[in-house]
């Protein structure tokens, strides 16, 4: 399986103030898209995306375990020392999966809050593992797709796309019989 990542930049910050005067920060917008050829030349068939998002919602979102990181790491695992937000919802609207995430009070969450306060435009990039099949001029994500996170917070679409292409060409992730993912050179 290869590391697959996608970038979306239509994310809006939301700041709410609770009764105790504390501000809560959220990001909301399109996290992922199905049945559309994206900028990386990939298509996520809706039936594959829907099955995986349903699993992700049950196993991660509903259990408050759907973390995302600030930046885009090289592997499929979540690094708790880099977590910046917790995805609270991920729902299908047409071909779009709209997400909402609460910015946490972690060191990286505080960086995100400062960026929002200073007017930065942030994007999200999904991260998962799966196989790709070339069909015509697009690569189709196959049924073994596994979502690692519906969204890491990133700044610039060009850098994450170039970075992920490099990973996809050089590293494959193999699930061992012990359930541990291992990186191997492709």
Where are these regions (language model features)?
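Polar/acidic, low-complexity leader/linker segments enriched in S/T/G and N/D
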Residues: 1-63
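Residue microenvironments linked to proteolytic maturation
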Residues: 3-4, 13-17, 21, 26, ...
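Acidic/polar N-terminal loop/beta-strand segments that form early-domain functional surfaces
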Residues: 32, 69-73
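Short, charged/polar surface micro-motifs in flexible loops or helix N-caps
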Residues: 36, 75, 105-107
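Acidic Ser/Thr/Pro-rich low-complexity disordered segments
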Residues: 42-43, 73-82
């Amino acid at each position: 399986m290869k590391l697959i990542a996608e970038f979306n930049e239509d994310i809006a910050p939301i700041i709410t103030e609770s009764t105790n005067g504390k501000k809560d920060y959220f990001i909301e917008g399109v996290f992922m898209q199905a049945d559309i050829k994206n900028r990386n030349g990939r298509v996520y068939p809706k039936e594959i995306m829907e099955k995986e998002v349903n699993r992700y919602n049950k196993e991660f979102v509903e259990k408050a375990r759907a973390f995302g990181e600030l930046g885009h790491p090289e592997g499929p695992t979540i690094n708790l020392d880099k977590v910046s937000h917790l995805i609270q919802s991920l729902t299908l609207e047409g071909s779009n999966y709209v997400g909402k995430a609460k910015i946490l009070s972690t060191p990286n969450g505080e960086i995100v809050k400062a960026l929002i306060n200073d007017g930065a435009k942030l994007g999200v990039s999904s991260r998962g593992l799966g196989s790709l099949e070339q069909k015509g001029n697009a690569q189709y994500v196959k049924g073994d797709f596994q979502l690692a996170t519906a969204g890491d917070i990133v700044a610039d679409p060009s850098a994450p796309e170039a970075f992920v292409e490099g990973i996809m060409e050089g590293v494959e992730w193999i699930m061992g019989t012990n359930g541990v993912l291992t990186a191997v050179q492709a």
